[in-house]
């Protein structure tokens, strides 16, 4: 299901990029990986602060071996929004996931 959703986001992003590109409007998306936050804290951390089994599985599938930090998402958004650094970037989905989407598990 995740693959289908990711492909849907890519298709929509690319369609919007083509549709609005002639007007000078860029359309890009960010595909975040796993970030520890208040809403998922109990799923990822035990009462003593150690990782749950679920968190260990996520970390094992993330080549960088950790959860993302909010400022890493902010950096990606600022890059994509910048007319100086990304004025010719259009129609992409930028993974900010520590390599999770690239990892095959071997």
Predicted regions mapped to residue ranges:
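Active-site helix of classical SDR
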Residues: 5-6, 13
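Residues in well-ordered alpha-helical elements
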Residues: 10, 38, 71-74
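Short, flexible catalytic-loop segment of classical short-chain dehydrogenase/reductase
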Residues: 31-43
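C-terminal substrate-recognition "lid" of short-chain dehydrogenase/reductases
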Residues: 66-96, 101
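Rossmann-like NAD(H)/NADP(H) cofactor-binding core
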Residues: 23, 28, 92
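Alpha-helical segment proximal to the catalytic Tyr-Lys
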Residues: 18-22
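Catalytic Tyr-x(3-8)-Lys segment
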Residues: 50-72
């Amino acid at each position: 299901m995740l693959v289908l959703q990711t492909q849907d986001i890519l298709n929509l992003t690319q369609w919007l990029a083509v549709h609005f590109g002639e007007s000078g409007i860029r359309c890009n998306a960010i595909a975040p990986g796993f970030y520890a936050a208040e809403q998922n804290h109990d799923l990822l951390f035990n009462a003593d602060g150690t990782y749950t089994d679920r968190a260990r599985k996520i970390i094992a599938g993330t080549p960088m071996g950790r959860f993302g930090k909010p400022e890493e998402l902010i950096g990606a958004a600022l890059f994509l929004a910048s007319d100086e650094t990304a004025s010719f970037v259009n129609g992409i989905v930028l993974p900010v996931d520590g390599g999770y989407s690239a990892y095959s598990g071997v």
